[in-house]
């Protein structure tokens, strides 16, 4: 039987979903310009490092903490995590990219779903108390859809791997087959 809640969350992983992920490289562009990333192998090495050093321990860990805060109705913990995620991204481009993606994601999610937490998070941004990080938005949406946290994190990481790979396919350039090979190899056995 198909789990429709999972499909609804997975919709936000689609590279055609208009969050702006396709236009943010999160540092990849710099590595390409410096010829550190220039082919399939060097991109995959960069992607593994980004996934293991940045996404897993910053976004992934925060997602688990946000999920727990949602379960405990701890709004202050969510605001604290929002600020931490924003300031730990040192490059201005990365901070702005995350902010734009989070803003777009929460607006789209709020249009599609009636979630008190997403509405609250958006209101906090309007009151200048929150930035709207995509990892937090995605977690709130998954929580609203009653998807377990492990799946929420897996989908979020997949979405990032897929988007960054599509960016690399265009920027390096890599072929579409090479891009799909990389995405396939990034999925744990």
UniProtKB/Swiss-Prot annotation:
UniProt key word Lipid biosynthesis: no
> Its biological function?
Required for maturation of urease via the functional incorporation of the urease nickel metallocenter.
Q: Which HAMAP family match?
A: UreF
Q: What is this protein called?
A: Urease accessory protein UreF
Task: Give a single Pfam family match.
Answer: UreF
> Where in the cell does this protein reside?
Cytoplasm
Please, which domain of life does this record's source organism belong to? Answer: Bacteria
Which species? Staphylococcus xylosus
What's in the GO CC field?
A: cytoplasm
An example molecular function term from Gene Ontology annotations: nickel cation binding
> Which keywords label this protein?
Chaperone, Cytoplasm, Nickel insertion
Keyword Repeat in record: no
Q: Which InterPro entries match?
A: UreF (IPR002639), UreF_sf (IPR038277)
Record family assignment: Belongs to the UreF family.
Renumbered to this chain, the signal peptide range is: none
Q: Quaternary state and partners of this protein?
A: UreD, UreF and UreG form a complex that acts as a GTP-hydrolysis-dependent molecular chaperone, activating the urease apoprotein by helping to assemble the nickel containing metallocenter of UreC. The UreE protein probably delivers the nickel.
């Amino acid at each position: 039987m198909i789990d429709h809640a999972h499909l609804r969350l997975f919709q936000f992983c689609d590279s055609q979903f208009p969050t702006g992920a396709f236009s943010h490289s999160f540092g990849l562009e710099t590595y390409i310009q410096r010829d550190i990333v220039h082919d399939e192998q060097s991109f995959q090495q960069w992607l593994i490092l980004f996934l293991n050093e940045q996404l897993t321990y910053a976004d992934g860990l925060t997602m688990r903490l946000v999920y727990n805060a949602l379960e405990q109705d701890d709004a202050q913990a969510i605001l604290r995590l929002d600020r931490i995620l924003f300031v730990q991204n040192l490059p201005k481009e990365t901070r702005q990219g995350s902010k734009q993606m989070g803003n777009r994601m929460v607006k789209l999610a709020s249009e599609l779903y009636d979630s008190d937490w997403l509405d609250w998070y958006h209101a906090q941004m309007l009151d200048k108390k929150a930035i709207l990080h995509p990892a937090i938005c995605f977690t709130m949406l998954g929580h609203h859809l009653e998807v377990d946290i492990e799946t929420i994190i897996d989908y979020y990481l997949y979405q990032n791997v897929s988007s960054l790979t599509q960016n690399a396919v265009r920027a390096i350039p890599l072929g579409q087959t090479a891009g799909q090979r990389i995405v396939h190899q990034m999925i744990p056995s």
